[in-house]
Every structure is written in C-alpha cells, then in structure tokens.
Swiss-Prot record:
InterPro entries: CLU-central (IPR033646), CLU_dom (IPR025697), CLU_N (IPR028275), CLU_prot (IPR027523), GSKIP_dom_sf (IPR023231), TPR-like_helical_dom_sf (IPR011990). This is Clustered mitochondria protein homolog. Keywords: Cytoplasm, Phosphoprotein, Repeat, TPR repeat. Its main location: cytoplasm. Residues 9-25, 1268-1280 have a biased composition (Basic and acidic residues). Residues 1-35, 638-672, 1268-1315 are annotated as: Disordered. The modification Phosphoserine is found at residues 279, 281, 655, 725. The lineage of its organism: Eukaryota, Metazoa, Chordata, Craniata, Vertebrata. It is found in: Cytoplasm; Cytoplasmic granule. TPR repeats lie at residues 980-1013, 1022-1055, 1106-1139, 1148-1181. Pfam families: CLU, CLU_N, eIF3_p135, TPR_12.
C-alpha cells in the first residue's frame, strides 16, 4: 500500500526550501489534477481462481482479479488453445447469466472455487460475422502480412528469430557454456570496417511464417443475403469454402450454428447436405469435413499460443514498416469486406450505427476524477477513445485523398472541398478562402493544422473542467495534408459568424468576448503562461481576451463550451518574424536574425516557454539573494542603490534593461553557494509567522521588475500571444504593458539562441544525450524547445565548436536530417501532381533522382499516358490527386539536388556543399541506405526488401516494382497516464538516490497503473520495463531481469519500430542479461543484431558503437574467440579515443580490455604496450596512489613476469631443440565471472556488497565529493541535467572508471548501489 503523491512530497521536503512567492513555473503539479491530497491507493486486489466448464473439453481453473470485467474472461477463452473457436457464448454462475460489462467483484456469490459454465448462445448476423472474422484471425495468426500492410494495429517483431523463441524456462534447456564455434562468427557485413550495408537482414525470415495451409478459400458466398423465406428458417448468411483437399462446399450460418448446404456456384439450394452435421462452431464443422484442416489447425493453434503475447497484442496506434518482402496476395473475405464497408455494422460492441466521436471524446473527459480508481477509469476511457478516433480519422483521410468520399461541397474546386465521413470532418491543407493571405497563403494553411494540434495537446494536458477541445488528427498522405476533427453538435446548421461568441473569425478585425470563456481560459492561463489582455475591435471597443484572437469559442447544441483554432496558443518566434521598426537583441542580430520565413505562423515551443520562465525564475532568485546579502552587509549602500532603481555594483550593476536573455545562462547552477543564497533568501523572505517584511517586499519588487514579471509582489511571467499579430490593435492605456511584452518576446527569442542551442551542443559534447538518427535528434531539440527550423543554426554552432571532432556524429546526423527534410518538402509538391495510376512510377523516379548514382534515370509513364489520346472530358469532380500532370517525369538528379541545396539554404539557412548524392556521401560521410530509411519514414514510402545497387552507373537503383505502398504519416494527441507517470518519476528519483528496493516498488506500481490506462503496449511501459529489468539485474535476480527486458525489447520493436535507436539500446541490455544467465550464443546473436541495426541507422562511427563493440569483444573474449574479439575491441578503442580524447579514463579502460585479450593470446609485448598506455592515463588523471593506478601497475608486473617466463622457455627451446624438457605454459582463458565484471563496468553497473551502515557512509561520501567538485571545478553537470520531463529515461552511459571521483557524475544511472 502506498500513499499517492507521498514520494514527490518527501523529495521536496528533502530539498528543504520554502520558496518565495511564485505564481507560475515548472514545479507545479498537473493543473486541474487534484492529486495533492494524501489519498490511500490499494490497487492490487487479491486475485482468486474460478473453474470453467466448457462443452467438449475437461474443466479447467482460471486465475481472475476482482476488478476485471466478465468480458475479459470472454477474451481469455477466445484466446485459449482449447476454447479459441468459440465466440458466441455467455457465462453462467449457478444458472444465472452474467452481464458482459459488470466487474467480477460486483457479481453476487462469485468467490474462490466458483464454477462458471460456458453456455452457447444463438447467433445473430452480427455475431455470425464476428465469428467468421475471429476464425479468419486464428487462421492468419502467424501470418505477418497484416503487420507489413500496416493493418489493424499489427506491427513487426523479430526478437524471437535471435533468441529461438522464449528466453524464460526454455533458456535453461539451451546450450549453456558448451559453445558451438559457428555461433560466434558474425556475418561479414557486421565486422568493423565492412563497407557493405545490406538491407535484407533487417527483416529476417521467421520460420513460423511458412504458412500451414488449413483451407484454400474461405469467403462470403454470392448467395448472400438469404432471401426472406430462408431468413424465416434462421439462415443468417452463406459462406463458400474450398478445403485443402480441393473439395468445394457451401455453408449456412444459422441462428443455431453452421452446417453444409447443397448450393453450388451456379445453383442455390439451401437444404442441408450430408454429412448432416450442425456445429455451433465453424471450426468444428471444418474439422469434420477436412482432415488436413483438423491436423493443421491444431498445429497452428499450438504455435500461436507458444508465441510471446507481446508479439500478437495490438498496438494502440498503427506502426508502419518502410520495407516489406514480396508477398503473395491471398484471397481474404474479411479484408475484402473491410475495404468496401466502413465496418459500420459491427464496430466493437457499439450499439447503433456510426460512432458519435465528439460525444465519446467529451463524455470521457467529463468522467469523475476525485480519487485514483476514478482517475484510472477516466484516463483509460480517454486513451481508448483517442486511439480509436485516430485509427478512424486515418482511414477516412486516406479515403478522402484516394477519392472515395463524396465532398459536402462537390461543386467547388477540389482544393476547397470538405468532407464528412463516419462522423468526422475532413479538410485539406490549402488556403481555401484567402483566409491565410496575410500569413503565407497555402504554406501557412499547411502549417496551421500542426500548430492547432499542438494547442489541442496543450489544453488537453491542462485539463480544465468545463472547457472542451475537438478531437484532432493531422494526416499527411500522398503529398496532401488532411485535418480530421470531431464535429461540434449543431455547427453545420449555423453560420460561423452566429456561432462564435468568443475570439475572432477574421484574425482580429471583429473580436468578441464572453465572461464564461474568460473564466474558463483564466484557469489555463497560469500553466500556459498566457497573459489576460485587451484588444480593440473594428468599432474601437476594448475587448478582453485570455488567448490569442484566432482562438474561437463556440457553445455547441450540447451546451458545452468548445475552443478551436488554437494555432497561436504560444507566442510568436521573432527570429522568424521581421517587424518593421523593431530591433532584436544583439544575440539575434549577430546570428543573422530576424530572417523572413515562408509563413508568419512561427511560434515558440511550449518547452522553450517553460525553460525561459524557469531560467528567469533562477535569475529572479539570484537578484533577490544578491540584494538581501548586500542589505545585510551595508544598509546605507543598499538604500542608495535601490533609490536609484539599480542593483548593487558588486556583481556588475544590471539595470532592468540590461537583464539580457542570456543573463545567468552560463553561471546557472554553477556553484554551491548560489543555491545556498537561494535557500537563505527563501528563509529571509518568509519569516516564521508567514508575513513578509517591508525590506524583503522591496527586494521582491525590484527583482520582479528586472526579470519582467507581470506582478510586483510575486514572480509571474506570462506572454501575450497577440503581440506582433498583423491586424491586432491594442488600447492606448495598455501601451506600457505592450512595450514590456514586446521586450519579453525579444528576450525569449534571444534566449533560444544564446542558451538553448549552446546548451544542446554542450549536452551533445558531454554525451548527456546521444541521438542516433534524425528522429532522435529532432526529439532532443524539441525537448529543449528548439524548433526544427533552427537545425541550420545548430549545425553552424557544431562546426564552430572547439570540440568539433567530438560532435562528428551530431554533424553527420544533422546534415542527413537537413537533406532528407529538404527532399521531403520537394517530394510533397512533386506528389501532388501525380495521378494515382502513376504513383509507383513517380516515387521510384524520385528515389532514383535522390539516391541513385545512375546519371539520367528515365521515368516510366503509365501505359495509358502513351496510348490514349482521347482523354474524356469529365474531370471536374476528381479526387485531389488526379491532376492531368506528367511534369514529374522530367525531373533529373541534377535538378533535384539543386532544389535540395536551395531548400536547405532557404528554409534552414545552411549551405550544402554538394550537387549530387555521391558528393553528399563523400563530403559528409553519409550512407545512402540511411538516407533511404530517413526519407521513407518521413514520407510514408514502403519499398521492397532487397539489395539495391545505389552506386551502379549503368542502371537506376529503383524500378516501379520496388515501391510497394505509401502510408499516411499521422500526428495526434497522446493522452497521458498522469498518476502512473508521477510514480515512475518518484521511482526513478529513489533509484538515483540509491534506494533500489523502494524504487523498484514504485516502478512496479507505475507499471500496474500504466497497464491499467494504456493496456499492455505503450512507449512508457517500455521505459518502465527496462528500468525494472536493470533493477532486478542489480539486485541479482537474473531471471526476472531477463523476463522484463525481453518484454521491453518486444514492445520497443512493436511500438517504436524494429530499427529505432531505442530498440537497439534494448537489444544491448538484453544481451547483457543473457550473458549473465549463461546464454552466450543468444547474447552474441542479440549484440550482432544491435550492431547491424546501428550500422544501418547511422554507420560505424558513433560513440555508442564503442560501447557496443566493447560488449561484443568481451563476450567473444569469454568464448575464447581472441582474434575476432580484438577486431571489435580495437575498433572500440579507436572510436573512444576519437570521441573522448586520448587521455580519457574511458580510453584507459579500453586499453586494458585489449591488453587482456593479447594476454590470453600470449602476445605479451602487445599486451604490455596497451596496459602501459592505460597506466599512463590513470597516473596522469588520478595520481600514483589511486586504486585504479595501483591495479594497472600490478597487472603490468604480472604481464612482465609472464613475458619473461615465455622468453625463458623460448630460449630453452632454441638452445636444446625439441628435446628440451620444459613445463607446459599456462595460458589463462578468462573466467566468465571476470568477463561479466568487465561487462558490468562498461555498461555502467556497479555492485557494492556492503552493510547498510557502509552504504549510508558511502552515499554521504559520494555526496560530499560531489559538492566539493562542484565548488572547485565550476563544472557541475548534475545540475544542468535535471530529470527529463519525458518518461523515457536517458540511455545509461558506460562508466569509465569505477573507483574514480568522476564516476558519480558520469550519467543518470551510472552509480547503482546494492545493499
């Protein structure tokens, strides 16, 4: 049992500062979240077991939990091997039928040992359809085609290929230490230095995918639906089946079950055929008529249940694969039916026809949230309806672009058309009625939906009761952007002018306000840092707003208050919005800003606003502390300086104007004394009785004024989002406020350039963050509030950095990202001019121009373009993609690359030094396969899995047949499990303080809550499992570590992608736990897989590759593959030296690992040479007396003795020839324990078997050293890396030296203590 919120409270108490007044900032709980009360949670109700009696099988026991629903037992039975063929049944307890949707704890008389009877129910058409669909799913359960096709939330996983199935108990039966040498040899393309980057190993063939054919055909019969007279006999529908033995049969699905009828393909005869066998289950009927079906279906189900559940559970959002093998297209009745209906008749358990998405989305928000069980129920409902809405919206958007949905305004031009499908409203990203004329036209219309989505995301997170947003999904597909929104009840019957009662429909000319909206939005203004302000409307009346003018308030027919058009929720980014007569701070003009962007909707990110406010808060504390100290020191001086309105001169007088955005940037948190001042200030301001003395009040007033706070009694920074909006006017009386707000915006723009971008580069230099591909680089930038349009500036700073070599990987990733983003911008407009019939030809031509060395690829026009001269004239109502345009076919590689360079300069302000792909590869060290992956992921292209000869100058790399599909790229809201997240963070904090057991309990609790809200599959659950696995490993429970990490790998593959950098990390962790569990060949397979993926995603030269190669080298050393081991360890040494410098402790460790292998090979001279290098580094860095230096010195002596002994023996042989009588030399094969110790060291895991008291002393000592270091070196890394707000913990870094004082600051989890 835990007290909710207790941990975070304790953490704050431990820090022990009572802070001065602060009205906003980052340390608030989730607004609108009433979790602060001490409330007791009891999540784990004890489970109990019930007995299940099903027809035709032995009774069996089932473990259930009281908060499960009866429906969940249904699901379990539909999944079990022996009952999976039943779908239409009810459960009875003592003769009473149980309600599907009731919780087990509410069922009277249900207890330990109760007997539940499975009773077959009569079918309806809907139940018969569900049954056929379920049988089809069982037949296809091992077939990966749905995952390759991106259907029904299926996605790929390949872990089982490398682990030979499950790692649990079966792992113990595998070869342990008897190693088959073949297992150790990596494929040639994985070895260090290999230039080959094959694509096929990305998706290895899984032997379970060789389909066992149970039936040749199972499809709906052409005789459907049954005629009236047959309906009255109970016929529901007819099926047509061809068995594996080539027998054709027609089957009737009736209310009582399934039986054969006498119909043929051309003759309808519904009478029962022989054998006259009526079965409630279609599977039982097919078992009767086909021996092959009976045999193969049983084998199939056995294999299905042996697979790990995580390989088959649906993911919450669809994940698409950018490559797929050539698949045969098989007949599939369910797929065919899905394609031509919208599944409206039988959406899962939804009564009526289509779902009312808006009502569902808003009702779930209205659920109660006073205590934890209520909040869990609410968050689960919100998450479920969001993932369903996203799936439906994606499907609808594709149908709209493919031309399969009728427009609601069909007579208008295609760009202006709007659509409604399945109760969702769809609009295209074009500037329809010159709405965005002043903001950038179509370009602004393309950007506005994502800005709006960010606004929806933010308001949803603040979660104010009574304020509603629309369900919003933005879909990019075939070059078009489609916005899908839920529909406000009644909005289609009224004019927009009548509906809008708050905000403006014409960007600020006419503006209205409403007291209820002001009241609701006021509650969001603090967490969102939005200033309540007044503007003038077209009649020069003052109107009060608490949002940007574009934000509209509409009361729906359901009485709810909706806000929409949230595209300016955050303040404008002045670096990309030149305003005549406005000067930007020097930091901006030095960097070449302001720059004219192609639209005027550039906003600062929420993360930037939060970081800026946090930075200003620290500055506020420092200024106030400084004044207070000087008040104490000299009252006279202080009085004078305060009267002059300045600050005391001891730390360079800074007046209000000179508080630049970068003030305090470098010094932030740079000394222990700074924090002490802040604490002292807090204590001084808040005296015992809670009053504030007048002098302190004066101090606060001055500090508030200096940092731009809107209040003079407390720190409170907010932004006016309408500042610099074209067309928005402010009253005369607000001029001072407007001037201050303009200055604040300028400071924020400069803060981004002077603090955030250098901070990012610094973090990259110190390897606090390790992006591996474009997506992870973008994520790292966005976490710091840096928009992608600043990518060119980031790269400029990297180029000018003194640590340029240490940032080689960042530069390479950044250039690749810049090129592929520029190519994506061009591809978008390129695709809009392509007819559906020319899509694969156009995409393959684009890829050839982009990536192939073939100098002049020729586009293959669709055949009808060449033949048909008489094109029909009916072209008005064509789908958006149906332009009569073959302009795409004339593009050349030279032209495309010229455009890419132009786009890079224009958009990112970066000059690319290349005019072809080969030049780009050569100049920047890029890989074509990596560029192919990046462009495919960004645009939704799926290509054939095969080896492409990019470098051939005789034929183009891609043909039409190589482009298999184009998928949508979907942006949507990600609802959060807030309570689970708080537990996860508290658990992380406990672990970092060394309290492993308490941390483990909190993380376990978080896992339960995450599962409760998200179901079994989610990115955040993946992070949770990884941390749990590591904790269990440190605490010595290898089996549990293995089980959790296996789940983490499977989940990462399924929800993030099989080659996502996170998946690569997970593979490495799993390999370590496998090695510790003596599964050596599996450990190597996993490490080889990780290395292959890293080579594909980035290439050879990444700091993380050093860690990976050290792992591989150590394992190979352990299995006595010394030559192979050296190849990897020496590569790791080279990479470590490059990125950390030749004198780093990590390099010393690397030398030591290489020396050990040479010792095992009895090549003592090389071993000595490497160990000497290591010894020199230890001696220089740590001094003679450090334990590491001594260890190295001892090892050197030992090596010298062995070398002398060997030399003596050799001399003996030379002297006496073969008759010499010499004792055999002892070569030491490394023990598994010593290898594991070294593996733990390089992976940043430290075991300290100490008593509790020793542990406490050690913690105190570590803390003391840490503080000393901060004070002495002014290089406190720990403070500059606060715990990330994301649930994803940073990848743990390897620790170079366990005994060194550097250890404690090496990375987030580098120091793990075990009691």
């Amino acid at each position: 049992m835990l007290l909710n919120g207790d941990c975070s409270e304790n953490l704050k108490k431990e820090e022990g500062t009572s802070e001065p007044p602060r009205e906003n900032g980052l340390d608030e709980g989730e607004p609108g979240d009433e979790t602060t009360g001490q409330e007791v949670i009891v999540i784990q109700d004890t489970g109990f077991s019930v007995k299940i009696l099903a027809p035709g099988i032995e009774p069996f026991s089932l473990q259930v939990s009281p908060q499960e629903m009866v429906q969940e037992i249904h699901q379990v039975l539909m999944d079990r091997e022996d009952t999976c063929h039943r779908t239409c049944f009810s459960l009875h307890l003592d003769g009473n039928m149980l309600d599907h949707f009731s919780e087990l704890r509410s069922v009277e008389g249900l207890q330990e040992g109760s007997v539940l009877r499975v009773v077959e129910e009569p079918y309806t058409v809907r139940e018969a359809r569900i049954h056929v669909r379920h049988v089809r799913d069982l037949l296809k359960s091992l077939d990966p085609s749905d995952a390759f096709n991106g259907v029904d939330c299926n996605s790929l996983s390949f872990l089982s290929v490398f682990t030979d199935g499950d790692l649990g108990d079966s792992g113990k039966r595998k070869k342990g230490l008897e190693m088959d040498p073949i297992d150790c040899t990596p494929p040639e393309y994985i070895l260090p230095g290999s230039r080959e980057r094959p694509l096929c190993p990305l998706q290895p063939q899984n032997r379970d995918w060789k389909p066992l054919q149970c039936l040749k055909v199972l499809t709906m019969s052409g005789w459907n639906p049954p005629p009236g007279n047959r309906k009255m006999h109970g016929d529901l529908m007819y099926l047509f089946v061809i068995t594996a033995e080539d027998r054709q049969v027609s089957i009737t699905a009736s209310t009582r079950g399934f039986y054969l009828n006498q119909s043929t393909a051309y003759h309808f005869n519904p009478k029962p055929a022989s054998p006259r066998f009526l079965s409630h289950s279609l599977v039982e009927l097919l078992n009767q008529i086909s021996p092959t079906f009976k045999k193969n279906f049983a084998v199939l189900q056995k294999k299905r249940v042996q697979r790990h559940p995580f390989e088959r559970i649906a993911t919450p959002f669809q994940v698409y694969s950018w490559t797929a093998p050539q698949a045969e297209h098989a007949m599939d009745c369910v797929r065919a039916e899905d394609a031509y209906t919208s599944r409206l008749g039988y959406e899962e358990h939804i009564p009526g026809q289509t779902r009312d998405w808006n009502e569902e989305l808003q009702t779930t928000r209205e659920l109660p949230r006073k205590n934890l069980p209520e909040r869990l129920l609410r968050e689960r409902a919100i998450f479920k309806v969001h993932s369903d809405f996203t799936a439906a919206a994606t499907r609808g958007a594709m149908a709209v672009i493919d031309g399969n949905v009728m427009a609601i305004n069909p007579s208008e031009e295609t760009k202006m058309q709007m659509f409604i499908w399945n109760n969702i409203f769809f609009s295209l990203g074009f500037d329809v009625r010159d709405h965005y004329k002043d903001f950038g036209g179509d370009v602004a219309a393309y950007v506005a939906p994502t800005n709006d989505l960010n606004g929806v995301r933010t308001y949803n997170a603040v979660d104010v009761e009574g304020l509603y947003t629309l369900g919003t999904v933005v879909v990019d597909y075939r070059g078009y952007r489609v916005t899908a929104q839920s529909i406000i009840p009644g909005i289609l019957e009224r004019d927009q002018e009548q509906s809008v009662i708050y905000g403006s429909i014409d960007f600020g000319k006419t503006v209205v306000s409403h007291p209820r909206y002001l009241e609701l939005l006021e509650r969001t203004s603090r967490p969102l840092k939005i200033l309540r302000h007044r503007v003038l409307n077209d009649r020069d009346e003052e109107v009060e707003l608490c949002s940007s003018v574009e934000c509209k308030g509409i009361i729906g027919n359901d009485g709810r208050h909706y806000i929409l058009d949230l595209l300016r929720t955050f303040p404008p980014d002045l670096n990309f919005l030149p305003v005549p007569g406005e000067e930007l701070p020097e930091e901006c003009s030095r960097a070449g800003f302001p720059r004219t962007h192609r639209h005027k909707l550039c906003c600062l990110r929420q993360e930037l606003v939060d970081a800026f406010v946090e930075h200003r808060y620290l500055l506020f504390m420092k200024l106030a502390a400084l004044q207070l100290m000087q008040q104490k020191a000299s009252k006279v001086e202080t009085t004078t300086s305060l009267e002059n309105g300045g600050l005391p001169s001891s730390a360079e007088t800074k007046s209000e104007d000179s508080i630049g955005p970068e003030a305090g940037c470098e010094e932030e948190g740079s000394s222990v004394s700074g924090l002490a001042k802040v604490k002292e200030l807090a204590e001084t301001i808040a005296s015992d009785d809670g009053t504030v003395d007048p002098r302190s009040r004066e101090v606060i007033r001055n500090a508030c004024k200096a940092v731009g706070s809107i209040s003079s009694t407390a720190f409170d920074i907010r932004f006016n989002p309408d500042i610099f909006s074209p067309g928005v006017r402010f009253p005369e009386s607000c001029q001072d406020e407007v001037r201050d707000q303009k200055q604040l915006l300028k400071d924020a723009a400069a803060f981004l350039l002077s603090c955030q971008i250098p901070g990012l580069v610094k973090d990259c230099t110190e390897y606090a963050v390790l992006p591996m591909d474009g997506a992870t680089l973008a994520e790292v930038m966005r976490q710091r509030g840096i928009n992608m349009r600043y990518l060119g500036k980031v790269l400029d700073l990297v180029l000018r950095s003194p640590a340029r070599d240490q940032l080689d990987h960042i530069y390479k990733i950044g250039i690749g990202e810049l090129i592929t983003r520029s190519a994506k911008h061009i591809f978008k407009t390129y695709l809009q001019g392509v007819e559906l019939s020319g899509l694969s030809a156009a995409i393959s031509h684009f890829l050839n121009c982009f990536l192939s060395s073939y100098p002049n690829p020729v586009a293959h026009l669709p055949a009808d373009e060449l033949l048909s001269k008489k094109r029909n004239k009916r072209r008005k109502n064509r789908p958006p993609g149906a332009a009569d345009n073959t302009a795409w076919a004339v593009m050349t590689p030279q032209e495309l690359w010229k455009n890419i360079c132009h786009e890079a300069k224009n958009y990112f302000d970066f000059t690319l030094e290349c005019d072809s792909v080969d030049q780009a590869v050569e100049t920047y060290g890029l890989q074509k396969i990596t560029l192919l992956r990046e462009i495919s992921l960004k645009t939704g292209i799926q290509i054939l899995l095969k080896e492409y000869s990019f470098d051939s100058r005789h034929k183009p790399a891609f043909t039409e047949e190589d482009v298999l599909n184009i998928f949508p790229v979907v942006k949507h809201v990600n609802p959060k499990a807030s309570d689970a997240f708080h537990f996860f963070q508290s658990g992380q904090a406990k672990v970092q303080q060394g309290f492993l057991k308490e941390g483990c309990e909190l993380i376990n609790e978080a896992l339960n809550l995450f599962n409760n809200v998200y179901g079994a599959m989610h990115v955040e659950i993946c992070a949770c499992l990884r941390l749990l696995a590591r904790l269990h490993y440190i605490m010595g429970d290898y089996a549990e570590a293995l089980s959790n990490q296996q789940k983490a790998v499977l989940m990462s593959e399924r929800v993030m992608g099989i080659e996502h950098p996170n998946t690569i990390q997970e593979y490495m962790h799993l390999a370590l736990y496998c090695f510790a569990s003596s599964q050596l060949s599996t450990a190597l397979s996993l490490l080889y897989r990780a290395r292959y993926l890293m080579l594909l995603v980035f290439g050879e030269d990444h700091p993380e590759m050093a860690l990976l190669d050290n792992n591989i080298g150590l394992v190979l050393h352990g299995v006595m593959e010394y030559d192979l081991s050296l190849r990897f360890l020496e590569n790791a040494l080279a990479v470590t030296t490059k990125y950390h410098g030749p004198k780093a402790l990590k390099v010393a460790l690397s030398h030591h690992l290489v020396a050990r292998v040479y010792e095992s090979k009895a090549e003592f001279r090389s071993a000595l040479q490497h160990e000497k290098e290591g010894y020199t580094i230890y001696k220089t860095q740590l001094g003679e007396d450090h334990e590491k230096t001594k260890e190295s010195s001892e090892y050197l002596k030992c090596l010298t003795q062995q070398a002398v002994a060997l030399q003596r023996t050799m001399n003996e042989i030379y002297r006496n020839g073969s008759s010499a009588n010499i004792p055999p030399l002892k070569f030491t094969a490394p023990s598994m324990t010593s290898v594991l110790e070294q593996l733990n060291v390089i992976n940043g895991i430290l075991f300290i078997p100490l008593s509790q008291k020793d542990l406490e002393n050690l913690k105190a000592e570590v803390a003391r050293r840490h503080q000393l270091q901060e004070a002495n070196r002014n290089r406190d890394k720990a403070e500059e890396q606060p715990m990330a707000p994301e649930p994803e913990p940073e990848p743990e870094r390897a620790v170079e030296d366990m005994g060194s004082p550097q250890t404690a600051k090496e990375g987030p989890s580098s120091l793990n203590l075990q009691g």
